[in-house]
Structure formats: C-alpha cells, structure tokens
Amino acid sequence: MNLSLNKLIGQRPDIQYGKTERHTPDWLFILWMGGTALLSYSLVYALRKPFTAAEFEGLTVAGMDYKIVVSIIQLIGYVCAKLFGIKYISELQPQNRLKFIIGSAALSEASLLAFGLLPLPYNIVALFFNGLSLGCMWGVIFSFLEGRRTTDILASIMGVSMALSSGVAKSLGLYALNQLHVSEFWMPALVGGLAFPLLCFMGWMMTKFPRPTAADIAARSVRVTLNGQQRWALFKQYMPLLLLLFVANLLLTVQRDIKEDFIVCIIDVDTISSWLFAQLDTIATLVLLSTFAVLAFSGNHLKVLYTLLGLSTASMGVLALLGSGEVQLSTTLWLFLQTLCIDIAYLSFQTIFFERFMLVSK
C-alpha cells in the first residue's frame, strides 16, 4: 500500500500546527533566517575544516602520510555521526536543539585543543571526535528551516555556506600559519576558538525563529519527530530509492572531503594568495545560490527533482573530464570548476532534493 508521509507520521496532539501567523515581510524573513543559518553552518566549518590549510609535510604515521591519516580519521568520525543522526536527529525535540548545538561545538573545540596538546601520533584520535561531534550539525540547523513555503530558498542559502565557508576556513588557516606564524597543530584550535562563541550565539538566534504558519503547513506539511517504527515504515516504502541516494550521498561526501582536505597539497599554495580560496568559493556560492533560487520558485516538485539529478550528473561528467588530464586549465579556473561541480551535486542532496522528495510523496 502506498502510504504518504503524512499518513505515516500522523497528527500529533502535542504539536501546535501553525496557530500563529507571521507578519514579517517574506524578504526580511528570508534574510533573517537564511542569513542566520548560513552563518551558523559557516562557523561549524570553522570548527571542522581549518586543519586542511596545513600540509604536515614530512610527517608519517605507520608509514602513511600524516595528513592522509588525520583526514581519514576525521572522516570516519563524521560518517559515524551521520549514521547515528538517522535515529538521533529524527527524535530530537525542538527544545533540545540549542543544547545539542552548544554541546557539539564544545566537544569539537575540546578535540581541537587536544589535537594541539597531545603528542604525535596520538593526537590523530582527537580529530575522530571532532568529526563525530559535528556530523549531525547540518540536520539540527536544517530542522529550524524545514516545513515552510520558503524552505527551498532558506535551504539554498544555508547550503551555499558549505561552498563559501570551505574557502574561508582554508584562508583563515593559511593566514594564521603564514602571517601569525601559529603552528600547524594549534592553528585549528585558534580558528575554532574564534568560531565557538559565535556559533553558540547563532544557535540561540535560531531558537527565536517563528513556528511554521498554517499556510506553511498546508503547503509543505507539518514536521514532527519519528520513532523507530515510523522510520522503518518510511524506509521500507522507499527502500530502493533511499539506498541509492544514501550511497550516492556517501560517495559525494567522501569525494568532497578528499578535495577539501588535500587541495593545498595538489596545488602550490606558495604561488597564490591566501585568500584565493575564499574569493573563488564566493563566486561559486553566488552561482549556486542563483541556480537554487530559480528552482525554489518552481511548483512542479517532480520537475525540480529531475533537474537536480540532471545538474548533478552533468557536474560529475565535468569532474571526470578534469580528472582525466585531457584538459589543460589555469590553476584558478581548475579550482573554480572543481568547487562548483562538486558543490552542485553535493548541495543538491543536502538542500532542496529531499524537501521536494517529501512533497512528491505527500
């Protein structure tokens, strides 16, 4: 029997279904919520990715390059958190979101301090907990935005923070290394220490977002927590598609992490400005935001899904061409295309794809 998501979830007597109306103009509402979410996840990146600016040249662990080891360790922690999040995020009550954000950010910064304090090679374990503590943050922040008529554009604004903040985190890390002469092991803690209090403040700001209105719920359906039985019923109904999407998303996550972690080793960073990563990622961010904004205004949910899949497939084709070595490009253009193509595919899944998927199955 083909059950809709609403039937699987049902109405919850303990949830207020849009009893208040929002009087804030839509454009101001989008700027407020989208901007806060964008800054929040940018700060998450500052806690997770500044170490990618370091090369750790000449260091090894058990015969393997040190940076490869720490990147793998952090990625394992991050993926483990994603798997735990399937259960945890779906059951997280709204009143506990801020506690989760503060606790996760605190554990992340503590792990970065441990990375600087502990001797080699034992400090690599600290980055496992760094990845573990931050792997669910996307889902928690996104839960403040979902279930609204403006969710597509809000999610797009939040999503492009990944493209923007990645370059900014690297540029901050390179600035700390090259201009402030901070060691490669303490640089992540310095950048993370600046981000931690700001992320806590942004988390508090998100608790002030208004609830979805009656019009939001009528257009997008109410979002409530799911217990184990409801999750299993939903998974069984869409199992083949969800498994394919899960594998694709996992591979994109790994591919993006490899690119983010080792790009400073692939190119000669001594020949470029420390802020080139931030500049290129800002341009890519504007392209992505424009693309997702156009799709956000489409009411044909199935057409949007097909468009996102088409864009993702095309971007992977361009990446394959770049990786083949058949095309000779300047460093700047190569970096830009790498960022744009990976983020088109990755952010499609992270932002509006699953929101529209839920609406198609409504």
Annotate the PLM regions.
Residues 1-28, 177-247, 269, 298-299:
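Intracellular loop-helix junctions on the cytosolic face of multi-pass helical membrane proteins
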Residues 49, 240-272:
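Extracytoplasmic gate region of multi-pass secondary transporters
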Residues 51, 135-148, 344-361:
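Intracellular juxtamembrane helix-capping segments at the cytosolic ends
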Residues 68-89, 283-291:
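Central cavity-lining transmembrane alpha-helices of secondary-active solute carriers
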Residues 104-119, 312-327:
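C-terminal ends and interior cores of transmembrane alpha-helices
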Residues 122-137, 328-346:
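Hydrophobic core of transmembrane alpha-helices in multi-pass small-molecule transporters
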Residues 151-178, 194-195:
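Glycine-rich segments within core transmembrane alpha-helices of 12-TM secondary carriers
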Residues 273-300, 315:
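Transmembrane alpha-helices of Major Facilitator/SLC transporters
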